Amino acid sequence: MVLRELSAVMQMGNKVVTRTELSSLGWKLFLFMGSYREKGDMKMSEKKESVKTYILGKWDTRTIVGVAIGAALFGVLMNFGGIRVFTNTSLTTAMLVDVIVGGLFGAVPAAVAAFFGNVISDLIGGWGFWLDWSIGNAVLGFFVGLLGVYGARINDGIFTGKQAVIYAVLVIVGNAVAFGLVTPFLTYVFYSQELTITMGQALAAVISNASVQIIVGIPLLFLLAKRNARSTNLKQED
């Protein structure tokens, strides 16, 4: 599958690629990383992972590639995959990148993908680099990516109703901390700006981001866990 997708990328170099085609291809490659496992991964997954591992992640080739694809996809979707709800604030599917990277790779990988994804978004948008929002997105990615800490093992096909509730609470708390506290504070420190507009953007971001990450994110996590559980069972039978 991955060879077909990479071949498609090479073919696109010879023609004009629409934003929809680019985003669709990005999601396919990204989700493929969630189900791909190298030989020996099954034995590794059977070992009890430490909380530290679920927070920091395992920075192997799979994680690095997943974070890189996630950051690129985040940057594209922040500009082309959303609906404007406030000044420079959108209801966007880019927020699902936090969910997938966090579920598959851990909290710090999700934070890194969100940080660099926002930097890429600023570069594509051409409105300058806003470090305050990049750090805010990294904080949110960290909260969202804590799934493994409370027992959600997406790679092993484990995601329960109780874990979904905990996830939803952390999404709300993470958005509130990231955009209600961290981003406004950094806006004032870095840019000495009046915070009225920033607080309006923060409120819109909290509501829109949490909505996407809960309403779409929870079914997506169940779907990924179910698919990985099926893949795990097939490999065990082999």
Positions of PLM-derived features:
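Methionine residue identity
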Residues: M1, M10-M12, M33
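N-terminal amphipathic/hydrophobic targeting modules at extreme N-termini
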Residues: E5, E21-L31
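Intrinsic-disorder/low-complexity loop/linker signature
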Residues: G13-N14, N88
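Loop-helix junctions at membrane interfaces
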Residues: K28-D238
